[in-house]
């Protein structure tokens, strides 16, 4: 396993067909072929089995572990409430690509779940935000003070509901905004080295140009190659030959056989930054061919 670092190259070619990855560590009994656009990478039966054992399925009411309720901010107008196991720390927030967040409370699973439901209904926040919406705003994020202020405002609204449907067994935690822009590399210019900081006085908008295209799906023989400049949730932001940034949702990779690509100069060979798979415009519905 190779560790990816910002500024390093990444390249691979998809081979053959995409097969179901199975469920809960078990191989798919059907060896099913799954669609290239599926972010789950599972056939219907394996997806059902995987979902049945998740916290979201509410089949683990006697779970003895402690859970935390979080308030997450993904961009202007995009907030959500969720829960995660306390032992996981902030891993769930990184997996979702939360730009900033704060813990709200901690307690037993069902108390955390009940609080989550109360807050969603009272505050009018969704239970999930599509990744397409998250991608569309990553290059246009406001500054750190505005991000922190948005989380603090949501926290104040949520805390005001304590005692109004909020289970007594859920302990409220103090506001502590965690900003993950730096962790995700969204404050870096695409030509910066791995240790560079944005220039003094430059905003995130100026330091991290917005990606305008995303990989729609992998195909047999399709190539993705570029330089890693940011990573948020499952998304890798890759700088490519035309100076733009293409997003690769790594969930689209599961189930494929991949081979490494090497740099070459031939007309049909792969260069250091090629994308030869279908792309889709971020924030729109237009589909493009690969970049050459």
What feature does the model see in each segment?
Residues 1-292:
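Non-catalytic accessory segments flanking enzymatic or RNA/DNA-binding domains
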């Amino acid at each position: 396993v190779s560790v990816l670092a910002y500024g390093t190259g990444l390249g691979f070619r998809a081979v053959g067909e995409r097969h179901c990855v199975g469920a809960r560590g078990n191989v798919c009994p059907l060896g099913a072929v799954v669609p290239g656009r599926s972010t789950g990478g599972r056939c219907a039966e394996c997806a059902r089995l995987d979902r049945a054992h998740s916290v979201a399925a509410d089949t683990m009411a006697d779970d003895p572990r402690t859970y935390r309720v979080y308030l997450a901010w993904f961009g202007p107008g995009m907030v959500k409430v969720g829960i995660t196991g306390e032992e996981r720390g902030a891993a769930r927030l990184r997996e979702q690509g939360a730009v900033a967040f704060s813990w709200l409370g901690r307690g037993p699973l069902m108390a955390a779940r009940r609080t989550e439901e109360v807050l969603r209904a009272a505050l009018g926040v969704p239970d999930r935000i599509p990744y397409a919406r998250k991608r569309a705003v990553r290059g246009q994020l406001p500054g750190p003070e505005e991000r922190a202020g948005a989380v603090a405002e949501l926290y104040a609204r949520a805390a005001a509901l304590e005692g109004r449907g909020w289970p007594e067994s859920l302990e409220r935690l103090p506001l502590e905004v965690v900003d993950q822009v730096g962790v995700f590399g969204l404050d870096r210019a695409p030509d910066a080295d791995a240790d560079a900081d944005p220039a003094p006085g430059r905003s995130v908008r100026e330091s991290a140009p917005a990606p305008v295209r995303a990989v729609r799906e992998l195909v047999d023989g399709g190539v993705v190659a570029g330089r890693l400049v940011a990573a948020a949730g499952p998304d890798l932001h890759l700088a490519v030959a035309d100076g733009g940034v293409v997003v690769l949702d790594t969930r689209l990779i599961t189930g494929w056989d991949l081979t490494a690509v090497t740099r070459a100069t031939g007309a049909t060979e792969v260069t250091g930054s090629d994308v030869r798979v279908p792309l889709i415009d971020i924030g729109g519905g237009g589909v493009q061919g690969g970049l050459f």
